[in-house]
Amino acid sequence: MSDHINPKYPDIPYLRAKAKKRIPGFAFDYLDGGCNAEINLDRNTREIREVQLKPYYLRDYQDISMETVLFGKKYSAPFGISPIGLQGMIWPGASEILAKAAFEENIPFILSTVGTASIEKIAEITEGSAWFQLYHPVEDSLRDDLLKRTAEAGIELLVILADVPSFGYRSKEIRSGLAIPP
């Protein structure tokens, strides 16, 4: 077995099953669900399973590196922790835990506009290396405040969410009684 794989966490389906047992139902539905009939969620899952990595045999493997440069900064891997709203609902201190792990492993961490940790706290944990995802609020003054706080905290990368003009219909959340304020 590879020494890079933690046998306690062998794969994503295993982690999902563990999370379903451990996280309250309404929070798991939020984390695991998608909008409308979950068509895009299903499509994304199917398409990622169709990705095939091409192996290169009989080559020197001593200097293998996944390092990459994104926006002028070198990271240990070409992926990071994407923004998840209401992380603290899923697990206490989740935003802080994930930000710390991302910082220690030198991968990007993106704080959601509706994250449960403050911009300032995440900037402190990541020494300003976090990214901030802006989900444009209805009120311009709120947007301006978020952007000001982000800049003052030393966060230099902004991810602007421009996929939908409003929150999607999430039937799992409706069934579980979860309601998110506007």
Question: How does the language model describe each region?
Answer:
Residues M1-G72, R170, G177-P182:
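An N-cap/entry alpha-helix motif that binds or orients negatively charged groups
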Residues P24, I81, A102, I160:
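Conserved, mostly hydrophobic/aromatic
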Residues N36-I39, M89-A94:
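A structural motif shared across PLP-dependent enzymes of the aminotransferase-like
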Residues E67, K74-Q87:
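Metal-dependent C-N hydrolase catalytic cores
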Residues F79-S82, F109-L111, A130-L134, L158:
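Hydrophobic faces of well-ordered beta-strands that scaffold small-molecule active sites
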Residues P83-P92, F132-D140:
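Active-site mouth loops of central-metabolism enzymes
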Residues L86, K100, K121, I125, ...:
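Alpha/beta enzyme core
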Residues A94-F132:
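A glycine-rich phosphate/pyrophosphate-binding beta-strand-loop-alpha-helix module
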